[in-house]
From Swiss-Prot:
The keyword Hydrolase applies. It comes from Homo sapiens (Human). Changing residue 88 to A/N: Loss of pyrophosphatase activity. Changing residue 65 to A: Loss of pyrophosphatase activity. This is Probable bifunctional dTTP/UTP pyrophosphatase/methyltransferase protein. One of its GO terms (molecular function) is dTTP diphosphatase activity. Changing residue 44 to A: Loss of pyrophosphatase activity. Residues 249-262 have a biased composition (Basic and acidic residues). S-adenosyl-L-methionine binds at residues 482, 508-510, 525. The record marks 23, 89, 179 as: Important for substrate specificity. One of its GO terms (cellular component) is cytosol. Keywords: Hydrolase, Methyltransferase, Nucleotide metabolism, Phosphoprotein, S-adenosyl-L-methionine, Transferase. The keyword Methyltransferase applies.
Length: 621
């Protein structure tokens, strides 16, 4: 609560965070700050050797990030933001500055250097106040840094590589995230924990106090320490306009003492009321409102993809809203609002010339991009969205809602719900293809699979994962096993290339037909579709096909054991309720299932994105 008055000074200002870091965004959002996110395009190529101290480098980088955003926004629409916040976090050990690793080998080198040693985490922060005068941008910069000492335990090579393969180190200074899996590497922390996460909130609030609440004479007489955040009542006494009303010139009857006592009593009552209000006033529910209204943003994105807005803008000059509207048979006013919210979400760029795609939109949202998620988005728009409108029924009944969404009972879930027509089958395959391509490299490299000369991707759909396995392991022959209706169309998703000779397609039902022979069986996002009895049936069939020493690679989204914190996995488990007969499971649940069917030596790698990989070995009975 003491932070609210400080943050409140920025409440009605246009505040911009010049950082794409989700951790910084979360820290500031949780503190009640309202802000836009405009990632800086400043190239972080400052000469580190030219700075006398590491924190000097961090502060200068933070300042340049903020100034770049301030200038870009002003040039864009000649309207300066009120405040731009820039930040840069670095890790230093032995005089060496460590930033974000460039690849997995670099991440391993960084973490090896930190093993068993104490290092410093510096975050430089720049607060840039902007104004315009005579059509010129004027900026005032306030900057500071925070240092936190962190000590790592002695770490084994195996543990370091397991963490590197999780993918978590790749976007973090020093190659670790203390707030997530990286916390297991840390032995002790001395200083501000949030500084290590990415933003020193406490010091930031102190800096706001210095900027917006300079010390008053009476504070100085009382030797108030302004390197700390003042108590809440200090803020209430301050205002943007000093002064107050004059005293009455005529005095009422009564003794001076009586009036003094009455005045003191009234003041005490007012102060008590003021304190009671401050103590009972809850923090502004920013995060809650985002959850309540978040579906609007999601539907905006889904609709833009449905109208193929990002296809129209790919590799094209900026276009006006009216021009785009005419191409998709939409109203100009409606299209302008849709494009504006897409720009606010960072999916489009908006200039005086019109709207254009961001790099994110070109890569992921245009339907012909190499890593396009357009098919996945259409699956969510055309099917998942409708199913979730019946979530209340799913919770009450404990069953999927295809019968309500489709108007008929699905006797065979996949045949009736996903493959009922060539169009719905192709939509489902495009959805699976997009998501699999996005994660296939992480899955294929999660473990060293070079000992296996053959693999069978059970339910492998378009063969996207099979192709990545073939690319990573040139000696491996990979068979994609799926239903005949899927195999019939799968070849359309396979681009030409040297991996084609390693990949084979076989049609069949994995619950009924013999599985192709292989040394490694892969079940990628298969088991979560099914209830326990069918999971046992499928694992039993895989186990029967395995010789001792054969491997089973499971790829799923793991729940945490207490089902409290793995938000994406918990969300997907709810998704499985409305869509399928299955559910998400924890590592402990999968380990029990695997051991029951003769698979042991269970290893797990958290892939850092949306999936987790489990590798187990079939042992002799």
């Amino acid at each position: 609560m003491v932070l609210c008055p400080v943050i409140g000074k920025l409440l009605h200002k246009r505040v911009v965070l010049a950082s794409a870091s989700p951790r910084r965004q979360e820290i500031l959002s949780n503190a009640g700050l309202r802000f836009e996110v405009v990632p800086s395009k400043f190239k972080e190529k400052l000469d580190k050797a030219s700075f006398a101290t590491p924190y000097g480098y961090a502060m200068e980088t933070a300042k340049q990030k903020a100034l770049e955003v301030a200038n870009r926004l002003y040039q864009k629409d000649l309207r300066a933001p009120d405040v731009v916040i820039g930040a840069d976090t670095i890790v230093t050990v032995g005089g060496l500055i460590l930033e974000k690793p460039v690849d997995k080998q670099d991440a391993y080198r960084m973490l090896s250097r930190l093993s068993g040693r104490e290092h410093s985490v510096f975050t430089g922060v720049a607060i840039v106040h902007c104004s315009s005068k005579d059509h010129q941008l004027d900026t005032r910069v306030s900057e500071f840094y925070e240092e936190t000492k962190v000590k790592f335990s002695e770490l084994s090579e195996e543990l370091l590589w397991e963490y590197v393969h999780s993918g978590e180190p790749m976007d973090k200074a020093g190659g670790y995230g203390i707030q997530a899996l990286g916390g297991m590497l840390v032995e002790s922390v001395h200083g501000d924990f949030l500084n290590v996460v990415g933003f020193p909130l406490n010091h930031f609030c102190k800096q706001l106090v210095k900027l917006y609440y300079p010390p008053r004479p009476e504070d100085l007489r009382r030797s108030v320490k302004h390197d700390s955040i003042p108590a809440a009542d200090t803020f209430e006494d301050l205002s943007d306009v000093e002064g107050g009303g004059s005293e009455p010139t005529q005095r009422d009857a009564g003794s001076r003492d009586e009036k003094a006592e009455a005045g003191e009593a009234g003041q005490a009552t007012a102060e008590a009321e003021c304190h009671r209000t401050r103590e009972t006033l809850p923090p502004f529910p920013t995060r809650l409102l985002e959850l309540i209204e978040g579906f609007m943003l999601s539907k905006g994105l889904l609709t833009a993809c449905k109208l193929k807005v990002f296809d129209l803008l790919k590799d094209e000059a900026p276009q006006k809203a009216a021009d785009i509207a005419s191409k998709v048979d939409a109203s100009a006013c409606g299209m302008e609002r849709l494009l504006d919210i897409c720009a606010a979400m960072g999916l489009l760029e908006k200039t005086e010339q019109g709207y254009s795609n961001t790099e994110t939109a070109n890569v992921y949202l245009a339907s012909d991009g190499e890593y396009s998620l357009h098919g996945f988005i259409m699956h969510n728009n055309d099917l998942t969205w409708n199913l979730f409108t019946y979530l209340e029924f799913a919770i009450r009944e404990g069953t999927n809602q295809h019968h309500r969404a489709l108007g008929k009972k699905a006797e065979d879930l996949f045949q009736d719900a996903y493959y009922q027509s060539p169009e719905t089958r192709l939509r489902f395959m495009r959805a699976m293809h997009g998501m699999t391509k996005l994660t296939a490299c992480q899955v294929a490299t999660a473990f060293n699979l070079s000992r296996f000369s053959s693999a069978c991707d059970v339910g492998g759909c378009t063969g996207a994962l099979a192709r990545e396995l073939a690319r990573e392991y040139p000696r491996m022959q990979v068979t994609v096993f799926d239903l005949p209706d899927i195999i019939e169309l799968a070849a359309h998703f396979q681009p030409p290339g040297p991996q084609a000779v390693q990949i084979h397609f076989a049609a069949g039902d994995f619950f009924r037909d013999p599985l192709p022979s292989a040394e490694l069986y892969v079940l990628c996002r298969i088991l979560h579709d099914w209830p326990d009895d069918k999971v046992h049936k499928l694992l039993s069939r895989v186990a029967e096909s395995c010789k001792p020493g054969a491997g089973l690679l499971l790829v799923e989204t793991l729940l945490d054991e207490e089902k409290r914190v793995a938000q994406r996995a918990l969300m997907q488990s709810l998704n499985m309720l409305v869509q399928t007969e299955g559910k998400e499971r924890s590592l402990g649940e999968y380990q029990c299932l695997l051991e029951l069917h003769g698979f042991h030596q269970v290893q797990v790698v958290h892939l850092g994105g949306v999936l987790d990989a489990i590798l187990a070995t079939k042992v002799a009975p």
